[in-house]
Each structure stands twice: as structure tokens, then as C-alpha cells.
Amino acid sequence: MANPKVFFDLTVDGKPAGRIVIELFADLTPRTAENFRGLCTGERGIGKCGKPIHYKGSTFDHIVPDLMWCGGDIIFENEPIHSEELDDEYFILNHEDGPGIISMADSNGSQFQIHMKDYGLQVDGDHVVIGKVVEGLDLMRNIEKEVITTTTRTPSKPVVIADCGELSDYRSERCYLMKNIEKEVIIKTAKDNKPVVIADCGGLSDDRSERYYLINIVVACMVLMCFWSWFV
């Protein structure tokens, strides 16, 4: 079974910036990867403090250009995600496979780091590697250029995970595209004040449906020709 993939839709200063896609190494760090996946989907619901246990709406608190991004600080008042914190899983994966390597902070709770360069032995054995950014590194580098960090490593403009979730298959990508198309249609409709109508619809299980459609057209044409010849 293929490793799961999750996504972050980012905004910079409230404006859509783009999407990054992350492959989780569930085959090697199953518990920690599953923990991260659940935080992306928000399936754990609301925590004891009344806050969603979800990366959606959270910010990247620290961004060091060409070094690392730190995010995921969503646990309030040391509220655990599980009944107890996860033990550090496997350190068999290292940080030399960057850039784009993602690892969990020492607490193994919700905080994570995206490494923008090869770290090597500096953090190996301390942070559990759980995945890697497979799409969107160029986007992150462009954001680094736009967001000039302060001496405290805090971005000058808020970088927010506006939406996140799991990409289970190609249907998730279609939903993402349809969501953006839907927004565009709504905007155009509001401006033009014209209704959006589904002129026709149906299911095409395979190529036979197309053939049946063509056959029906041919039969209809033949019937019309017969009537025409009858009256003529």
C-alpha cells in the first residue's frame, strides 16, 4: 500500500499562496505518521480546551530562510492529543534526504519542522522523521523571499495553513480543483446575475454508454428518414 499524502493550502498575509503536498512515511514510522495525518484531517474533533485538534488555521511561528519552518503549535495548556504522549518512534530515518524533510519536535505532540536543507547529524536521533514535501518546495522558497523574518525568526507577514487534509486518491485532487472552479463560478454569477444551469447530466460507467448514446441518435435519424420517405 502506498504511503498517505497530506496537503497544506497556505496563505500569506491573508492571500492564497498555493499548496504543498507531503508524503508521510507510514511504512517506517506508522504511529507518528498517523498522528500527523490525523492532525491534518481534523478527525480528532475538539479538544478539552474547546479548540480543534487540527492544523487548519494554524500559523508557521518561525521561518528561517533556507533552513527550516516551524509550525503545528496547536496544543493548548499542554493538552495531550492521546492519552499519553507518543514515545519517540524510530530514528532509522535521518535528515540528510532534504530539503523538504519533515520531523516532529522533541515532545512528539503536534509541533513539526520542515527542513529546507540537509541537516545531517545535527538533529538525527532527536527528532523523528515522518515525511517529506514532494510538491511545493519552490512555493516555500518564494514565500521565504516575500516574508522577511525578524530577529526572533517570526515572519513579518502571517503564513497560515488555511486548509489541510489527506489526498487519498485522484478524487481528492478533483475536489480541490472543483472547489476553486466553484468559487470562480459563484463570483462570475454574482457579477453577471445569470443562473448556472446543469443542461444535462448522467453517469458513464464505461465506453458502452457512449456507444448506446450514438446508437440512439442513429436510430432516431433512421426513424425520421422513414417518416420523411413515407410522406414524400
Curated annotation (Swiss-Prot):
Pfam families linked: Pro_isomerase
Keyword Membrane: yes
Keyword entries, A-Z: Chaperone, Glycoprotein, Isomerase, Membrane, Rotamase, Transmembrane, Transmembrane helix
First-tier enzyme category under EC: isomerase
Function: PPIases accelerate the folding of proteins. It catalyzes the cis-trans isomerization of proline imidic peptide bonds in oligopeptides.
An example Gene Ontology molecular-function term: peptidyl-prolyl cis-trans isomerase activity
Catalytic reactions of this protein: [protein]-peptidylproline (omega=180) = [protein]-peptidylproline (omega=0)
Annotated EC: 5.2.1.8
Cellular component, GO annotation: membrane
Topology versus the membrane: Single-pass membrane protein
Keyword ATP-binding recorded: no
Transmembrane segments: 212-232
Similarity section: Belongs to the cyclophilin-type PPIase family.
Residues linked to a glycan: 108
Subcellular location: Membrane
PANTHER family: PEPTIDYL-PROLYL CIS-TRANS ISOMERASE (PTHR11071), PEPTIDYL-PROLYL CIS-TRANS ISOMERASE CYP26-1 (PTHR11071:SF552)
Protein name as it appears in the record: Peptidyl-prolyl cis-trans isomerase CYP26-1
Tissue specificity remark: Expressed only in flowers.
Every PPIase cyclophilin-type domain range: 7-166
Source species taxonomy: Eukaryota, Viridiplantae, Streptophyta, Embryophyta, Tracheophyta
InterPro entries: Cyclophilin-like_dom_sf (IPR029000), Cyclophilin-type_PPIase_dom (IPR002130)
